[in-house]
A protein has these predicted regions:
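One-carbon transfer enzymes
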Residues: 1-206
Length: 206
């Protein structure tokens, strides 16, 4: 049975696009039923429309009184969601949603967490720090989402080597390729029921 997926995105949604392409190639036993975005002008919405995926705009302008994201939770519950994927989503997920969908929300982060994680570390800002500190390695992390920024259990990480000649933009491009690779891998693991939990401990079934 196909897994029901909802994607959250705020920008270009390249990871969203990558997952869609893998589904089209029958490499994922899943279906994306909804795109949630806080940004009505983001490119991810254009891609959702092309692929006949419903889009839901959720932000403080539309719902100024929904401080706990209860309206959003009600919307999600209509889709019998198996998995929520954050793909460059720039807003914090509420406690009500992270608790209801515990161990069912994944995020991709452009660093080797816990390094360069937390509030304020996202996108090019991460790569600028890596470049400024002259790090010779970086990478990407797929983790489960909890109530805080970038602190949930880590599912997958992949490291890459960096040279002194690579600036923040070059690092970003290199890391994005890794993001696409390991996010697909993580979603595949979930769809194939290889992820299990025992008393809060993450177990991977071979």
């Amino acid at each position: 049975m196909k897994k029901s997926i909802v994607v959250f995105a705020s920008g270009t949604g390249s990871n969203f696009k990558n997952i869609i392409e893998k589904i089209k190639l029958h490499r994922l036993n899943a279906q994306i039923n909804l795109l949630v975005s806080n940004n009505s002008n983001c490119k991810a919405i254009d891609f959702a429309k092309i692929n006949n995926i419903e889009t839901y705009i959720y932000n403080s302008k539309r719902y100024p009184n929904d401080l706990n994201q209860d309206v959003l939770l009600q919307k999600l519950n209509r889709y019998k969601v198996d998995l929520i994927l954050l793909a460059g989503y720039m807003k914090k997920i509420s406690k009500s949603i992270t608790r209801f969908y515990k161990y069912k929300i994944l995020n991709i982060h452009p660093s080797l967490l816990p390094k360069y994680g937390g509030k304020g570390f996202y996108g090019i800002k991460v790569h600028e720090e890596v470049y400024k500190n002259q790090d010779r390695k970086s990478g990407a992390t797929v983790h489960f989402v909890d109530e805080n920024y970038d602190t949930g259990p880590i599912l997958l990480q992949k490291e890459i080597s960096l040279s002194s000649s690579e600036d923040s933009l070059a690092i970003a491009k290199k890391v994005l390729d890794i993001e696409h690779e390991i996010y697909f891998q993580a979603v595949s693991m979930f769809c194939n029921d290889k992820i299990h939990w025992n008393k809060g401990k993450l177990l991977i079934k071979e």
